[in-house]
């Protein structure tokens, strides 16, 4: 029997039992059975003690829940009546009634139960037909499992009994597989179910205020991926369908999901279809439970019984900054700003051509959530969250391979606040100019009605927009990157008729994001904009990436610099490890170098080169980086062999290996964006 609610000493928002860093696992819990894709030496590995394992969370539910509310069922929606003489007419009426009820639940107008009990109603075993119809109304589902979960969370009040949440996720997984049969998940809906389940748990962990021993414990990305993979490998279909053969894609996918969910919590749908912020709704956090109830196939994944499952949204305010203090000071004081690029003869004819790669100017919208505060600098105390030491499963990194082409996980949610997906997002009018390596943002005052349309760049025009703006900013595009949201997000038109995203689809508005990298002044920042059309969003993206690629140095130093630190794969280790006492080796933590381009966003010391030369540099760099990624993967098996003698060493080296891989892969994708933008711009240049 699993522990009762009173026996669980430490529960998070879902009621998931939280383990301290020094908590011990039993021997049976500590063995990880490898899949066919594992090397023989990695068949039995100790699991990570730092995160609540999926196999701990999904315990076999044997105890009944005495406190669960009584949820009414509908006779017309009852599945499995056992009656064989039901006429086709009655069957059609049942289907129609189920569809009607599902539609009313989606609209929030179903009156038989409170909207807070919709999830319990749908998850009730007697209402399978209604649940099926409800999930169909959400189709076509996005190609991202996380975005699918976002759609579900904003469509229904997702606080319910554990087993009811579980049934909803299972049905959603089946529908997702039906919509996307040709992914690396193949027909494995159970595996998708596990991922959705894991994301739900991760959301609770990242965005609640639960503390253990006065410390706020958060799952690391590695721990999240490690434990999700462990649960996947326990599922029979993972091997039967050979899903493990694409595990490198799954690892990439999970890492992107972590980044997105870390920035943007799942919303909590209310009766008025508005999201609740944690700070304003602490009462909603009083109901605790654990996710999960069923046995996942024959793998005996278990869940701890509890009363209800709580999802909630937290005010995920982005850390704000002025991207360049010097630029903004000069901009606000009408002083000239330093040039960021080497001006060439062809620039004069293109620098004022609105709609080109050289210049974009328009009145558009910016997500209020991502809008920076007036004259604010980046919060110094939010540079980085403190890291916690952890012991990780050494099977986690087994088959990671680079993906140099666009994959299923290349969705914009990882770079955006997902305001596009939220009908309650607030937007502000802004005048945007992108030119000469910077983006200028003027936040228009709400009381200004008639705005003079002008794309001029003279001082009089700039002063006019300053006068009608409550705040304005000049951001350097050094190392920035833009993406069009609609390129990568598929939204079901039938999901919510009242949803803004469907209105966006009808009027064909566009959304694009601009990501600014982490630097010494603070963490990564993402701004989200909305344009009149997707075509205009693409033009902004091309212009931003063109200037970012033109002024951003190719980071060769990151890969060519020789360090005396040992990360676990030095030539001496790889060639002479048999004769070395490896226990005397000090393994340092691998981190990318902080280049001048991130220290000084307007630095004059950054080398300015001709456009042709920058294009050539990018072509050579992306080609070379692909070779470096391949070489980094080639040493993986060797590292496993060398460092398997000690868990601590193995963990440190594998963390280093993974960190460097992720850095290289992200750099590869960013430089490809730059390269494409520069190549497109070169088509309009005559030398």
Curated annotation (Swiss-Prot):
Q: Which domain of life is it from?
A: Eukaryota
Phosphoserine-modified residues are where? 293, 299
Record-linked PROSITE patterns: SEC7 (PS50190)
Q: Where is this region: Disordered?
A: 14-35, 63-97
Bias-annotated ranges (Low complexity): 73-83
Q: What InterPro entries would the database entry show? A: PH_GEF_YEL1, Sec7_C_sf, Sec7_dom, Sec7_dom_sf
| Phosphothreonine: residues carrying this PTM | 290
Its membrane topology is listed as: Peripheral membrane protein
Gene Ontology BP annotations:
regulation of ARF protein signal transduction
Q: Its GO CC terms?
A: cellular bud neck; cellular bud tip; cytoplasm; plasma membrane
State a single Gene Ontology molecular function.
Answer: guanyl-nucleotide exchange factor activity
Q: Which residues form the SEC7 domain?
A: 57-264
A Pfam family (short name) is PH_GEF_YEL1
Question: What region holds the PH domain?
Answer: 412-551
Q: Which stretches are tagged as biased composition: Polar residues? A: 14-27
* Compartment annotation: Cytoplasm; Cell membrane; Bud neck; Bud tip
Ordered alphabetically, the record's keywords are: Cell membrane, Cytoplasm, Guanine-nucleotide releasing factor, Membrane, Phosphoprotein
Name the protein family. Answer: Belongs to the YEL1 family.
| Function field | Guanine nucleotide exchange factor for ARF3 required for localization of ARF3 to the bud neck and tip and involved in actin patch polarization.
Q: What is this protein called?
A: Guanine-nucleotide exchange factor YEL1
Please give the organism: Saccharomyces cerevisiae (strain RM11-1a)
Name of encoding gene? YEL1
């Amino acid at each position: 029997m699993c522990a009762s609610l009173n026996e669980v000493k430490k529960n998070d928002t879902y009621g998931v039992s939280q383990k301290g860093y020094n908590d011990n696992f039993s021997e049976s819990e500590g063995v990880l059975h490898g899949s066919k894709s594992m090397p023989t030496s990695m068949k039995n590995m100790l699991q990570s003690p730092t995160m609540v394992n999926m196999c701990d969370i999904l315990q076999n539910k044997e105890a009944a829940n005495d406190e669960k509310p009584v949820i009414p069922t509908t006779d017309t929606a009852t599945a499995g009546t056992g009656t064989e003489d039901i006429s086709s007419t009655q069957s059609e009426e049942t289907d129609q009634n189920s569809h009607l009820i599902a539609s009313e639940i989606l609209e929030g107008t179903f009156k038989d139960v409170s909207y807070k009990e919709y999830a319990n109603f749908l998850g009730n075993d007697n209402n399978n037909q209604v649940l099926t119809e409800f999930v169909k109304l959400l189709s076509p589902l996005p190609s991202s499992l996380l975005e699918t979960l976002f759609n579900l969370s904003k469509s229904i009040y997702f606080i319910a009994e554990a087993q009811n949440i579980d049934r909803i996720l299972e049905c959603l997984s089946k529908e997702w597989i039906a919509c996307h049969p040709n992914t690396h998940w193949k027909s494995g809906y159970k595996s998708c179910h596990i991922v959705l389940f894991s994301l739900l748990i991760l959301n609770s962990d990242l965005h609640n205020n639960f503390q253990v021993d006065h410390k706020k414990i958060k799952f690391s990305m590695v721990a999240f991926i490690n434990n999700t993979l462990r649960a996947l490998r326990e599922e029979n279909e993972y091997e039967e369908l050979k899903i493990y053969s694409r595990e490198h894609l799954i690892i990439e996918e999970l890492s992107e999901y972590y980044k997105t969910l870390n920035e943007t919590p799942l919303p909590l749908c209310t009766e008025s279809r508005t999201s609740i912020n944690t700070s304003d709704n602490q009462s909603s956090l009083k109901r605790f439970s654990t996710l999960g109830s069923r046995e996942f196939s024959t793998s005996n994944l278990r869940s701890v019984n509890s009363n209800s499952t709580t999802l909630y949204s937290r005010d995920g305010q982005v850390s704000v900054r002025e991207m360049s203090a010097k630029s903004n000071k000069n901009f606000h004081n009408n002083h000239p700003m330093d040039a960021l690029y080497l001006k060439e003869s062809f620039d004069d004819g293109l620098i004022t051509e609105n709609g080109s790669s050289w210049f974009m100017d328009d009145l558009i919208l910016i997500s209020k959530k991502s809008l920076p505060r007036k004259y604010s600098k980046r919060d110094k105390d939010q540079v980085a969250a403190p890291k916690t030491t952890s012991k990780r499963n050494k099977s986690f990194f087994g088959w990671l391979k680079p993906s140099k082409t666009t994959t299923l996980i290349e969705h914009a949610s990882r770079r955006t606040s997902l305001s596009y997906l939220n009908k309650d997002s607030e937007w502000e009018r802004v005048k945007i100019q992108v030119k000469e390596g910077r983006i200028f943002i003027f936040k228009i005052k709400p009381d200004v009605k008639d705005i003079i349309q002008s794309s001029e760049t003279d001082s009089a025009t700039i002063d006019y927009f300053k006068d009608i703006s409550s705040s304005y900013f000049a951001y350097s595009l050094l190392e920035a990157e833009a993406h069009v949201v609609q390129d990568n997000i598929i939204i079901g038109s039938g999901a919510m008729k009242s949803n803004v995203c469907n209105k966006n689809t009808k009027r064909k508005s566009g959304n694009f994001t601009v990501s600014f990298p982490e630097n010494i002044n603070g963490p990564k920042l993402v701004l989200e904009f909305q344009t009149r059309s997707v075509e205009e969003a693409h033009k902004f993206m091309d212009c931003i990436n063109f200037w970012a690629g033109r002024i951003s140095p190719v980071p060769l130093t990151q890969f060519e610099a020789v360090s005396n630190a040992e990360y676990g794969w030095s030539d001496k280790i790889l060639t002479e490890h048999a004769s070395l006492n490896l226990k005397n080796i000090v393994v340092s933590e691998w981190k990318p170098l902080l280049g001048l381009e991130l220290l000084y966003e307007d630095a004059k010391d950054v080398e300015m080169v001709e456009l042709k030369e920058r294009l050539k540099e990018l072509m050579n760099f992306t080609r070379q980086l692909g070779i470096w990624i391949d070489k980094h993967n080639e040493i993986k098996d060797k590292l496993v062999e060398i460092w398997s003698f000690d868990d601590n060493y193995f963990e440190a080296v594998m963390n280093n290996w993974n960190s460097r891989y992720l850095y290289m892969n992200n750099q590869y994708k960013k430089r490809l964006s730059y390269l494409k933008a520069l190549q497109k711009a070169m088509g309009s240049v005559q030398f």
